[in-house]
């Protein structure tokens, strides 16, 4: 049974390694249950399942609740295709065919638990943090366009958790929001909070869309201590025609 994050969450750069691992793992451990998840395999799950008969199934889309229910399924000792088919958000095999068990309700970001209470486990590591999920843009070359609705974590929760990082003098916090500044009010409020509570040590990394930065945001960013804020700007193409595609 394999639900490790290293094998479970698939991105494009990992595919060649995952392909080899899936095939070889099944040879070594024929009884192992192999599940994959992540954007690359969720996009065309039925095709992936047909291409790799070694797979037990694929977790589609957001994995928090699906992963939990799948783990509970195995822990309970329940077996059989019928039991798996009751878990939403899966691509599985049933009666020799690949089926989808139905869509999973999108996760409310404000109910996801904070995982960094014990920082000893993350000593000398970059901490990843999510204050929003989804992207409002429709770039045809980007899988983020699949999740068209942007959801925000409650700002009171975000501020409390960021204050914890500041109090603990964490070296770096990397926001994994797809386009952090797609919601100006949300972004500005977080930046203003970080500016007011700067501890002189912690720096914050954001992925942004530079073309929607306005003068107000730039003025605010210019007030930060040098090195406090890192901006990752994706230059996908210098061709306006391609960017409009």
Can you say where each PLM-predicted feature lies in the sequence?
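Short, glycine/charged-enriched secondary-structure capping and boundary segments
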Residues: 20-23, 49-52, 73-74, 106, ...
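Loop/helix-junction capping segments adjacent to catalytic residues or to phosphate/diphosphate-binding pockets
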Residues: 1, 15-16, 42, 181-185, ...
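Radical SAM [4Fe-4S] cluster-binding motif and immediate context
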Residues: 110-244
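Single conserved hydrophobic/aromatic residue that forms the stacking wall/gate
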Residues: 1-11, 242-245
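A short, sequence-level motif marking secondary-structure junctions
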Residues: 103-109
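Short glycine- and Lys/Arg-enriched binding-loop motifs that mark or flank ligand-binding interfaces
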Residues: 2, 33-34, 130, 230
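Glycine-rich beta-alpha loop elements in corrinoid/cobalamin-binding modules
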Residues: 5-102
